Structure formats: structure tokens, C-alpha cells
Regions:
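P-loop NTP-binding core
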Residues: 1-154
Length: 155
């Protein structure tokens, strides 16, 4: 039987409400309890990526944008591709400003709501929890994140 990670999206339409801090602290807390945790930075501002010790997110590769692009092009990805390991016991899929361009590409993509789901399906067997740090919006990107966070959304 394959393991099914609990997926939690941390969302709010406003910026500066503590989404990133909540995502990071919840993730580290779960890791301290012995859980395998993946944090996914779905915000082009990359606050979670920076907060976890990556001060130049534009220099990172691959990022969430790159991984989603590969899925859109139907190129294979491996379950550990693009994942950074943090000393506090959490893993991170980083983001950067390129994710803004991915939002534009998703507008015209077939089955755009499945792109993030396809990525998460690739990695979920390796984790107990996957936490999604969402951008401040109720537009398309957040609604697609909600589609994937079938377990819980924190507002």
C-alpha cells in the first residue's frame, strides 16, 4: 500500500498575514515529531525559500516553476528532483520570480489544474506531510493549490 501524504495549503488573500511563518513553523514542528515533511513554496516572492536559508532564490535551479514546466512539456521528473534538504529536518521545493511566468503559461495550458497535482503525486510517497505556502491571492494559482490540498487548508 502506498503512503499518502497529508497535504495542507496555508492560504490568505492578504499579504503579511503569517502564511510563510505558519508554514515553516508547522513544518519544522512536525519534523521534530519525527514526521517526513516537504514544504512547497508556491509564491513567486519566494519568502519561504529565503526564510529557509536561500538568500538568492533566482540562483536556484530547479525550482517549482522548472518542475511544473517539465510536467507541462511531459518530461519525466524524479521524486527527489529539485528538493533541498534543510538542517531542521524539512525538505523544500524552492520558488523564485520565474513562478510568475508560470502563472501566465498556466492560463493557456490544457488541464492546468492538474499540473501541481501531478508533481505532488510524484513526491507524496516520500512524505507524511506536504505543506504548501501560497501566494496572497484568491486567483487561479491559489484555487489550483486548494484543489490539491484535499486534506486541509489553513486560512
Amino acid at each position: 500500500m502506498s503512503k499518502k501524504a497529508t497535504i495542507i495549503a496555508v492560504v490568505n488573500q492578504k499579504g503579511g498575514t503569517g502564511k510563510t511563518t505558519t508554514t515553516e513553523n508547522l513544518g519544522v514542528g512536525l519534523a521534530l515529531e519525527g514526521k517526513k515533511v516537504l514544504l512547497v513554496d508556491t509564491d513567486p516572492q519566494a519568502s519561504l525559500t529565503v526564510s529557509l536559508g536561500n538568500p538568492c532564490p533566482d540562483d536556484l535551479s530547479p525550482t517549482l516553476s522548472d518542475l511544473m514546466g517539465k510536467i507541462m512539456m511531459e518530461n519525466p521528473i524524479t521524486p527527489d528532483e529539485g528538493i533541498l534538504h534543510h538542517p531542521e529536518g524539512v525538505d523544500l521545493v524552492p520558488s523564485n520570480i520565474e513562478l510568475s511566468g508560470m502563472e501566465v503559461a498556466l492560463v493557456n495550458a490544457m488541464s492546468r489544474e492538474t499540473i501541481l497535482r501531478q508533481y505532488l503525486d510524484t513526491v507524496k510517497q516520500n512524505y507524511d506531510y506536504i505543506l504548501l505556502d501560497c501566494m496572497p491571492s484568491l486567483g487561479m494559482p491559489v484555487s489550483y493549490t486548494h484543489l490539491r490540498a484535499h486534506e486541509t487548508s489553513l486560512h
